Amino acid sequence: TSLSTLSFTESANLFAYSISEGGSDWNKIIIRNTQTMKQIDDTLIDVKFSGIAWKGEEGFYYSSYDKPKGSMLSAKTDMHKIYFHKIGTPQSQDQLILGGDDFKRRYLSAYLDEKENYLIVSAANTTYGNEIYVKDLNKKDAKFVAIQTGYTASTSIFKVIENTAYAITDLDAPNKKVIAI
């Protein structure tokens, strides 16, 4: 058994970690209270290639695939998806946020800006490049807005100040550059 990911809420009251067993890429996510160390929710299972991005203490975003038919070790997985897990609810009620047919053969990762106003998703190609999508979490019916498309560059947003995102990219910059979006 090995630790794959560890993530704390901003308040540090809760933390979640993922473990892998037997060298598998498939993980389990376990959520605990930092004061009591007691597990506070069911274990999330069948999670693959995922981070853990907390939204307050309400819940967190994570990535996975549909559970494959057949062997977990040899089945093809090609439609990565981002879900939101609300604390206190079963994994079967997790909300699909993005992914599926529109992102075939892509690795999706979700993270939030420091103030948790924006959900940022990177859709990475299997070889080079990524697309960036951003959703304003303060607007009830907000849709994802494409910031970079085409998988022709690798870009990562590292800071959001007010309504400006700052990113590092190699788009038209082989040695990379910082841009404001």
Model-found features: residue ranges?
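Beta-propeller folds
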Residues: T1-I181
